[in-house]
Amino acid sequence: MTNPQRNAEHVHFLRQLRLFLEEVCCEICRFQVVGHHDVGSEEALVSREVDLGVPGAFADIVVRSPNRPPFFVEVKYGYTSDRMVDHFVRKYSRPSPSVPDADRVVAVVDRAGRSDFEQLEERLRKETRKDLKLEFWDEARLQELVLECFGVKLGALSPEGLFELRNAIDDIKWRWAFGERHVESPLKDSLLWHFGYSRLLQLHKLHGFAPEQILPPRRFRNAVVLLADLSSFSSFVRDTRDDEVMRNALTTFYSNSRHAVINSGGMICQFVGDEVLALFGVPDVQDGYAMRALDCGRSLLQIGSSVSNRWQREIDRVQPSGGVHIGMAIGDIQSVMYRPFCRSHIGIVGDAVNLAARLLAQAETNEIVVANAYFQTLPDREHSGFEEMEPLEAKNVGLIKAWKLHQGSSYSTRGA
């Protein structure tokens, strides 16, 4: 006799496992393109939840790099065969308007326990359009890739084994960034969380920064502040009977949003409920950082639509809208320690944060509303997509000159 509670726990475990494997596969793909020690690794763009230009269809991962065709990665570990085929039909049976030049799809799947694996492989090849090669990463191949990339073995896919693997990978990333000199730094977890190893490596190599020099309590000038918020969040929560569905939706949003920020060279500051706070130009101002912040905002719009789509498929009541809305501003911010003589936990304050929050409140779903000073830092070619707004009245701030950018909605209430 089956145990419904145990079955539900296994389903939720598989969801978390797939999210974790997505993170691992992103690092593997980046490693395959640039290795561990290339400061120019920002040339390899590894994006998650990419809108394929088909209603309700998002690629789990898209990998782009110079002089190579992009390719897709689909993490379908634990999916039933029929469900996996349905997803490939929706995503890859016809050309993608947004990624038309991709040349292959990597399917990350579990072979063990699938008596129909050969038939599944044949079905997926049949439903995938002919110009896309199909490659499989099963348990054995994934073990090889994890060992090649991180130098550690992929052990048991259990909660305990995965906790150990994550900690081992974080230790290795810290060494990639700083070498052996700072292995005992108390800032390891905090800085890896805020920046990711690639950005830390860049700061260490370009400026010689030690961990304690990266985010000291001080003023940072001309930082871009990005605030993103899930639309209709309260409605989604109200209509969700299973708390695990809500928690999984938020974890998916957090994981993908953090990846988008770090992948764009930004700093993930914090999550508050369904809101993301990210900074660009901290601790150093890089060429093109304002444009990368906007690119990150566009990625977050796609991530928000994808998360809302998945959430809608789990509940009965149809939600009128889904996605995110975003506010952005530029200005000085201050980093502040939460406790004396402790750099592990910091807060961010500044007028630019308050201004971005006011603009966020004015943004509709799938819109980015930006302050005029930030708008003027963008290349002229980017101005054409923006629409000037009427001056906005903001409490305790005054009238604000702002611009908005609307991106077509990818939110869909259809599909399973």
Regions found by a protein language model. Give the residues of each.
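Nucleic-acid nuclease catalytic cores
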Residues: S96-R141, F375
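Catalytic NTP-binding/metal-coordinating core of nucleotidyl cyclase/transferase enzymes
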Residues: E212-D295
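Catalytic/regulatory signature loops of cyclic-dinucleotide turnover enzymes
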Residues: A329-I330, D351-A373
